């Protein structure tokens, strides 16, 4: 059968036409990190072009440096009264690193606070007609199909009602490796097509081989279909976006010829466990302060968080092709945290990267438990530490390098905080158990007194706590100032109680996460790869024995630190207790925060409520209703045996199989493919063949029309008359 005949057959088999549109191949070459590509940066076509205001940088970055310099000077003064010892020098260095990290967030928070006090500007582009084409991409990897396809259904329907639906095409780009989920995706796609084919163009493709994970998934789309579109709007499997936000992003991109990427700040929704609701509340109350401040000062040198953003296809394909790093994982191979790198490369090429902090209606979900957060952070940690290989890239803007550094510090800060705690503990134990050396080997008429300026130290502690909690304080002030905002979370009293509860619970969880991040960093430095595990998104509960195993080292660390503190004094133990209690109670805290029942209890009493929870947007309500409907549609999943037995089902399945060959002609066959070929060839019947396949082999068979046709020709079951003897 020719390609054109096959396309006609697909159109007849699938409602709404073929599973994917005709390909329009385009180049997306891996970018050089060691030299600036020819023709970069591009020249702007408008006056002033891609320029940012230096005054904003001076206020935030300069302010953070001045604040850090003051704090470091004060810390040095605390130790300098009697001369600084080696341990005190170490503590000073660790304090400097940690304080610089929180000072930048504090100064960004100040900027965000004052920006949020202003009235938002009206959207001048709201009525702009779209004459560009945008592909909305929903990558998925072993996710619940009911969640993914129902979300696309409601977003596509809402977008079609705006009058701009003609400017958008929807793509579900699957990297699913589980054969059962792959078949469920096909069932869900058929339902989606039935619902949307009259008003939207929705497509589906499952890659046969998920090279380079999500970045490779999107790159594969770009190389095969990207040239059909002006923009790419990238979502995640748990994303939702209001139609006004989708059209707003496209209108902004169309209006600014220098825009390479526009990133929204997603709100967290649909949290059911206590941990998820804690993250939702914190992100809603404090997140806008940091996000708005960041967007205000980075200006045209913003960042990309991997989803809920629109990208100019020309900029992405021409400047953001990711190279493989030399060596093996975790520091070599494919770039894991691709988003920061893609933003940096797009900016290097002369395009702007903007954070649209003023654009609401962008949503995502969060991990339901500490364990799920740890699994996600292990992967992110590896990707962010891998950015140490990207930092020397030729031609990067200094703000892009700062984004990479902050990503690295998001995880290295935990080992630095732990070292700071241990150094302080060692200083206390040294003063308690070791006799001071008043006269050193060098001649001096005056002794070296191991003393500190306690008043200055206490003052510096208060300053540090103010800087650390500053963004939270700004968020609370904005909440209390805005009566409508306060009412949307249950009123000012409930809001204050929620803030107090969030601070206490976050303080208990923080030391657990510190040790989790320390373990992740250590694992990466030892050369262990994170792999790619699908995320749990709803229930975070786990058996108690599993939690004891996962948190055993955290509890042991808490006991050891507590023992070391009590060797000095009960006062030191009391000072360290906020961190130690969380470690001692790691298992019950992990169990309770991952519980849906406890999450529902706090929801009933109105603690940790958010506006999106109390008064959800219509798109969120419709998504929940549609998900339940999709669950009902696919509650009886197809099996490969059914596909082989039913010719009509086989044709439906083949119409949704990716047409790209598993491997290029002349390239070596992979072991798993060779094994499947042998099993299919040797099989006496379909039943015996299916019994021989493992999940990986089953997924490969589903994606291979030739193997499926070969299996289809076999009898369904073995009968003695069909016995073939081999001599």
Swiss-Prot record:
Entries under Pfam families matching the protein: Glyco_trans_2_3
Location of the region described as Disordered in the Swiss-Prot/TrEMBL record: 18-42
EC code(s) of this entry: 2.4.1.-
GO CC annotations on file: plasma membrane
Main EC class the enzyme belongs to: transferase
Keywords, in A-Z order: Cell inner membrane, Cell membrane, Glycosyltransferase, Membrane, Transferase, Transmembrane, Transmembrane helix
Top-level taxon in the UniProt lineage: Bacteria
Pathway terms, separated by semicolons: Glycan metabolism; osmoregulated periplasmic glucan (OPG) biosynthesis
Family indicated by similarity: Belongs to the glycosyltransferase 2 family. OpgH subfamily.
Function: Involved in the biosynthesis of osmoregulated periplasmic glucans (OPGs).
Protein name stated in the entry: Glucans biosynthesis glucosyltransferase H
Annotated organism of origin: Shewanella sp. (strain MR-4)
């Amino acid at each position: 059968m020719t390609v054109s005949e096959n396309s006609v057959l697909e159109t007849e088999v699938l409602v709404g036409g073929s599973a994917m549109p005709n390909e329009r191949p385009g180049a997306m070459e891996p970018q050089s990190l060691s030299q600036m590509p020819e023709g970069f940066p591009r020249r702007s076509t408008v006056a002033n072009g891609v320029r940012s205001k230096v005054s904003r940088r001076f206020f935030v970055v300069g302010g953070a440096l001045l604040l850090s310099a003051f704090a470091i000077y004060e810390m040095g003064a605390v130790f300098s009264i009697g001369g600084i010892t080696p341990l005190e020098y170490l503590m000073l260095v660790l304090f400097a690193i940690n304080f610089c990290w929180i000072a930048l967030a504090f100064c960004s928070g100040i900027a965000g606070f004052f920006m949020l006090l202003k009235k938002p500007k009206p959207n001048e582009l709201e009525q702009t007609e779209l004459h560009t084409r945008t592909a909305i991409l929903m990558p998925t990897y072993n996710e619940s199909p009911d969640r993914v396809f129902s979300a696309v259904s409601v977003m596509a329907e809402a977008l079609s009602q705006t009058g701009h639906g003609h400017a958008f095409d929807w793509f579900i780009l699957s990297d699913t490796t589980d054969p059962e989920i792959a078949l469920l995706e096909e069932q869900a796609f058929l339902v989606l097509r039935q619902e949307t084919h009259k008003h939207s163009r929705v497509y589906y493709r499952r890659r046969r081989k998920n090279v380079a994970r999500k970045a490779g998934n999107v790159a594969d789309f770009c190389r095969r279909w990207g040239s059909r579109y002006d923009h790419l709007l990238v979502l995640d499997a748990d994303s939702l976006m209001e139609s006004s936000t989708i059209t707003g992003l496209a209108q902004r991109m169309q209006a600014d010829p220098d825009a390479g990427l526009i990133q929204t700040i997603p709100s967290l929704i649909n949290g059911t466990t206590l941990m998820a609701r804690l993250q939702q509340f914190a992100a809603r109350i404090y997140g806008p302060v940091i996000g708005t401040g960041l967007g205000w000062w980075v200006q045209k040198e913003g960042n990309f968080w991997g989803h809920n953003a629109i990208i100019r296809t020309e900029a992405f394909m021409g400047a953001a092709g990711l190279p493989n790093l030399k060596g093996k994982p975790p520091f070599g191979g494919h770039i894991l945290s691709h988003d920061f790198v893609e933003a940096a490369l797009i900016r290097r090429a002369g395009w702007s990267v903007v954070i649209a902090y003023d654009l609401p209606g962008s949503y995502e979900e969060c991990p339901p438990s500490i364990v799920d957060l740890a699994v996600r952070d292990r992967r992110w940690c590896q990707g962010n530490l891998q950015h140490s290989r990207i930092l020397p890239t030729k031609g990067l803007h200094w703000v892009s390098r700062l984004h990479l550094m902050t990503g690295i510090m998001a995880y290295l800060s935990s080992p630095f905080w732990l070292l700071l705690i241990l150094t302080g503990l060692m200083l206390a134990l040294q003063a308690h158990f070791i006799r001071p050396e008043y006269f050193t080997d060098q001649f001096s008429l005056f002794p070296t007194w191991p003393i500190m300026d306690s008043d200055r130290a206490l003052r510096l502690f208060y300053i540090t706590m103010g800087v650390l909690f500053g963004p939270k304080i700004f968020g609370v002030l904005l909440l209390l100032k805005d009566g409508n905002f306060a009412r949307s979370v249950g009123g000012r009293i409930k809001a204050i109680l929620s803030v107090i509860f969030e601070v206490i619970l976050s303080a208990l969880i923080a030391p657990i996460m510190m040790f989790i991040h320390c373990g992740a960093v250590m694992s990466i430095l030892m050369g262990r790869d994170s792999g790619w595990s699908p995320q749990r998104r709803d229930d975070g509960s786990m058996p108690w024995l599993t939690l004891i195993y996962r948190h055993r080292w955290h509890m042991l660390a808490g006991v050891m630190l507590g023992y070391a503190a009590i060797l000095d004094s009960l006062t030191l133990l009391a000072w360290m207790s906020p961190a130690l209690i969380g470690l001692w109670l790691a298992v019950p805290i992990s169990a309770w925060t991952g519980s849906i029942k406890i999450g529902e209890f706090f929801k009933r009493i109105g603690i940790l409520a958010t506006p999106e929870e109390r008064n959800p947007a219509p798109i969120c309500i419709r998504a929940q209703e549609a998900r339940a409907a999709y669950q009902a549609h696919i509650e009886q999943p197809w099996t490969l045996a059914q596909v082989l037995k039913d010719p009509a089902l086989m044709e439906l399945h083949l119409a949704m199989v990716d047409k790209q060959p598993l491997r290029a002609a002349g390239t070596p066959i992979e072991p798993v493919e060779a094994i499947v070929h042998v099993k299919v060839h040797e099989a006496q019947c379909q039943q015996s063949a299916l019994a021989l396949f493992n999940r990986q082999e089953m997924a490969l068979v589903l994606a291979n029309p030739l193997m499926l046709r070969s299996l289809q020709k076999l009898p369904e079951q073995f009968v003695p008359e069909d016995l073939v003897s081999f001599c």
